[in-house]
Amino acid sequence: MPRQDTSGRAYDLVLYGATGFTGALTAAYLASHVPQGCRWALAGRSTAKLEQLRDRLAQSAPSCAELPLLRADSGDPGSLRELAADTRVLVTTVGPYLVHGEPLVAACAAAGTDYVDLCGEAEFIDRMYVRHEATARASGARLVHASGFDSVPYDLGVRYTVGLLPEGVPIRVDGFVRTNAGFSGGTLSSALTAASRPVAMARAARERQRVEPRPVGRTVRAPFGPPVRSGETRTWGVPLPTLDPQIVARSAAALDRYGPDFRYRHYAGVRRLPIAVGGALGAGAVCALAQVPSARRWLSGRLEPGDGPSPERRARSWFKVRFVASGGGTRLITEVSGGDPGYDETAKMLAESALSLAFDDLPETAGQVTTAVAMGDALTSRLQEAGIRFGVVQE
């Protein structure tokens, strides 16, 4: 099946789920950053809500007054197939992806449409690989999950770091993330859904391992180890059971530049040991409560989908990820940093990922690919121009 020609489609980019909390932030970012001549549209279930969003966008970006609005619903696969067939790149913020995501992935894979999401749900991503990787490879579609704070800073940060180390040598990288940010109802819902399904998550991972090719003559690892004390970052490292190490490992498996023997470990960097211990215990308690349906509903009700931090709270938020790396006798520390990670910077990362797929000169890839593999330096440059900092730390 040849790669499908998408150049004659009605739109360069469509944002699906535009009226949600993160979707509206992404729409606002696109409104002020799409290049001249970009053909883009907003999509969602409610035309009335889409019209309200378009009116708000037009107040600061008058050209948005005539922005096309497309009605589509995750419960109506036919509407999603039409959506995918009309655009070159489809961006979605509609989660939890385990509940709402697969019909759109299937539609994009079949139509040869590039797909970008914010998914941090390992089970969903593994299932999409097993079910739709072959179709996407055949059609030429690039399926790029985890294109927000999960997992762009880590994926591109490690790629940036590896590029500063000698080639052809074993490489070790430890990532330490710190932030003061809040989160939204949609994020809480997705996290609780994922935490409530440990057995299903493990089963999906095994199914993927059975069919996914492994690098030949190279070793790639992302172990989940014990807490560590990092003298370089002056923090306690609490292991994070997030998707990010898996994404980094998949980039390393796909790119020879990561060396013959690559290892990545992923931590929350915490200044004081009691806080580290308390955070680990608290996360464990939430995961335990997520197994009980009534407790999960109670936790989910603390924040409704569509709710999120205020603009004032987001303005005070920040993130820093430090990478302590070594290889070939070279040791260095790099850092990726920016503002509010969960929303303002996530909207930026998602939007720039979509714009990169739509307009940048990128390597020929297809199927389920990471941001480091699909966009690499092009996306890093975009994010640097947009204010996210990549650099070497001078100790």
Spans of model-derived segments:
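Glycine-/Pro-rich loop/turn segments that contact NAD(P) or position catalytic residues
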Residues: 97-210, 243, 250
